[in-house]
Each structure stands twice: as structure tokens, then as C-alpha cells.
């Protein structure tokens, strides 16, 4: 197992912890329902547009290695990297454009909901403050929409099934006052038990007994991820409809 793969595995561990908690903080995720009447003046919005993932993770959340200190952590990272590589060798992120598919439907959906939309490209790995600022300073906007969007496969334990997991957060801010006009978190597929998110079930057959089953029918594995796109787009657009 290469150091780069293990390093990415460690990043996945941190990232997923953030996604499952909808934020790397001890406080609860603070939702904000969209108030159409109060936001009547919002016409033009800048939308944070992330590029696609270069890998889709395959991770066991409660890995046995987590109980054995530093050595266990190394074993866990290596195992996660191996499973992630196995998934991506079959799935091929170049043929699985989950994020691009999301924006291809979300941007027109927001326009149909009554907004003028400007997409602002942001590169994955950018510092959160910089990723926010590049959207916040877009010229002549009334509000800006911050998004996170990440997908992969999760299993609760070493002997439990893998489920698709796509996590998305959306936050609309007033450009002048910086007030939060809308804030919501969505989880598709794997149920983390987090009561602060909108959880959306995946299809019943999107359940894979182990990593070998996960890659045995890769078209089904891909479809179980991409099925999230329409669901999440429709949910967000409905929330923000004018």
C-alpha cells in the first residue's frame, strides 16, 4: 500500500467525520428554513460549483483497527485505502461524474424556480474561507449559495453491508447583510442516525454484503450513487422555490 493512498485514506476519515456530523464542530447543525416572503428581493444568486471527485471512498466506519492505537490506525488506513482503490478501479471516477451531474440539473432547476443563476467554479481541496469568498464577492448578486457535495460507500462495521452515501449541505446567504437565508443538510443512502439532517433512503437493493459484492456489478454500484442526484436536486429546489 503506497503512502499516497494511505494519506488519502486519512483524509477520507476526517472528511467523513465532518460529513456525518454535518460540520467539524461539537455544536448541532443549525438549520434555517427558507422564508420566501422575507427573501422576495433575492433575484440573482451566485452558486458555488465544485469540480468532480477524483475518488469515491469505501469505508468501514467502526473499523476494528480503531481500537488498537497507532498500529490499529495504520492498519485501518491501509484497509480503507485498499478498499477505496478496489472500488475506484472498477467504478472509474472519469465515468462517474456525480458532482457534474448534480450541477447539470441543479442550476437549471434553480433558474426554473425563479432565480438568475451564476455558477462560480471552486476546486476541491480549497480552504473553506477562500472557497466562500470567491462566491461571496461575485459582482451584482443578491445572495450566494454555498454547497458541499460528496459521495461514496459506507459500512457500519467490518461484517456489515455497504450502502451508498451522498452528503450535501446548502446555505444561502444575503450578499449585503450576510444573513443566513436558508441552511439545510441532506444525507442520501447510509443512515448515520444524525437527527439534524434530512435523510433520504436509497433503493432497497442498494445494499452490498462486502467489498467484493460492491464491485461485482459496477453498473448497479454506479446507479445507486447517481440515483441521489435527482432526489437531492428536487429537494433543494423545492426548499428554495420562490
Regions from the PLM with identified roles:
Residues 92-103, 159-163, 214, 218-229:
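Solvent-exposed, acidic/flexible segments
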Residues 25-31, 124-179:
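Surface-exposed short loop/turn segments
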Residues 1-14:
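Bacterial N-terminal signal peptides that target proteins for export
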Residues 111-129:
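Short beta-strand->alpha-helix linker/helix-N-cap micro-motif
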Amino acid at each position: 500500500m503506497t503512502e499516497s493512498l494511505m494519506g488519502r485514506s486519512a483524509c477520507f476519515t476526517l472528511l467523513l467525520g465532518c460529513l456525518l456530523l454535518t460540520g467539524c464542530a461539537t455544536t448541532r447543525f443549525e438549520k434555517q428554513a427558507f422564508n420566501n416572503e422575507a427573501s422576495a428581493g433575492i433575484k440573482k444568486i451566485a452558486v458555488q460549483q465544485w469540480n468532480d471527485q477524483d475518488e469515491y471512498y469505501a469505508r468501514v466506519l467502526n473499523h476494528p483497527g480503531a481500537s488498537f492505537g497507532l498500529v490499529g490506525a495504520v492498519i485501518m488506513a491501509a484497509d480503507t485505502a485498499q478498499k477505496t482503490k478496489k472500488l475506484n478501479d472498477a467504478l472509474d471516477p472519469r465515468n462517474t461524474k456525480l458532482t457534474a451531474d448534480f450541477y447539470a440539473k441543479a442550476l437549471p432547476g434553480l433558474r426554473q424556480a425563479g432565480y438568475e443563476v451564476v455558477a462560480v467554479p471552486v476546486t476541491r481541496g480549497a480552504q473553506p474561507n477562500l472557497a466562500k469568498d470567491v462566491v461571496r464577492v461575485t459582482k451584482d448578486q443578491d445572495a450566494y449559495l454555498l454547497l458541499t457535495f460528496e459521495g461514496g460507500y459506507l459500512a457500519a462495521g467490518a461484517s456489515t453491508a455497504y450502502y451508498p452515501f451522498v452528503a450535501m449541505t446548502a446555505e444561502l446567504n444575503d450578499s449585503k447583510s450576510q444573513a443566513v437565508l436558508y441552511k439545510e443538510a441532506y444525507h442520501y443512502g447510509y443512515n448515520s442516525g444524525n437527527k439534524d439532517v434530512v435523510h433520504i433512503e436509497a433503493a432497497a437493493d442498494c445494499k452490498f454484503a462486502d467489498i467484493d459484492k460492491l464491485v461485482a456489478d459496477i453498473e448497479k454500484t454506479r446507479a445507486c450513487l447517481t440515483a441521489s442526484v435527482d432526489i437531492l436536486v428536487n429537494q433543494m429546489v423545492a426548499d428554495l422555490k420562490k
